[in-house]
Amino acid sequence: MGLMNAFDSQTEDSSPAIGRNLRSRPLARKKLSEMVEEELEQMIRRREFGEGEQLPSERELMAFFNVGRPSVREALAALKRKGLVQINNGERARVSRPSADTIIGEFSGMAKDFLSHPGGIAHFEQLRLFFESSLVRYAAEHATDEQIDLLAKALEINSQSLDNNAAFIRSDVDFHRVLAEIPGNPIFMAIHVALLDWLIAARPTVADQALHEHNNVSYQQHIAIVDAIRRHDPDEADRALQSHLNSVSATWHAFGQTTNKKK
């Protein structure tokens, strides 16, 4: 017996009840800008406008859709957020291809809001741990000599920045970025950059002196990660990475507790 359509189980007696429910919940009307946005998006996806091609002018779009300038501008702004068009001052919108950065950027506001909730930072730190664990195992198994050299160079810059907290944070981010680049997947890179940006932005402000010891510990842990990758030992690389990120998490949690007590 085939699957029954959901409507087949409804009896005639239920029609008045359905009607009452529909009348009590009127359908929301779409804004004109949303309708223009959807139509333009479909035209772009159907290749009616190719990548790099300019869309019609605002005036032409207003006439074509029979809407005002605000609706056209709102629609174009929405398409820009989706990465489907680029808009430069004084020029018509130009069709573009969404990048991994654009896709991740759409979640940025929600991510920052989630981080501000209780437990939010811990959840994102766990996500980072799971994600970088896979990256470091891949690096230990597949990294080329050239890629390992890039890790070693990032490690050297790390060592030169130990007494300068701002520089060390940059070198720390760059070290992990090199790890994320090894698979050659742009989506991995976008996720990794966003994760670190979100987590770093959520960290408390800490006095420079308090960070110096943390910098040295992180640097030594980076050495252990690179050594394991150089030996092509994924298990040891994973252990070193997990030890490092758990240490970072515990340190910043302690900094946060201290900061809260002072308030």
From Swiss-Prot:
The keyword Transcription applies. Residues 58-77 bind DNA. InterPro entries: GntR_C (IPR011711), TF_FadR/GntR_C (IPR008920), Tscrpt_reg_HTH_GntR (IPR000524), Tscrpt_reg_NanR (IPR023730), WH-like_DNA-bd_sf (IPR036388), WH_DNA-bd_sf (IPR036390). It comes from the Bacteria. One of its GO terms (biological process) is negative regulation of DNA-templated transcription. PROSITE patterns: HTH_GNTR. SMART domains: FCD (SM00895), HTH_GNTR (SM00345). GO terms for molecular function: DNA binding; DNA-binding transcription factor activity. Keywords: DNA-binding, Repressor, Transcription, Transcription regulation. Residues 1-22 are annotated as: Disordered. Residues 30-98 form the HTH gntR-type domain. It holds the Pfam family GntR. Coiled coil: none annotated. The keyword Hydrolase does not apply. Belongs to the NanR family. HAMAP family: HTH_NanR. Transcriptional repressor that controls expression of the genes required for the catabolism of sialic acids. This is HTH-type transcriptional repressor NanR. It comes from Shigella sonnei (strain Ss046). The gene is nanR.
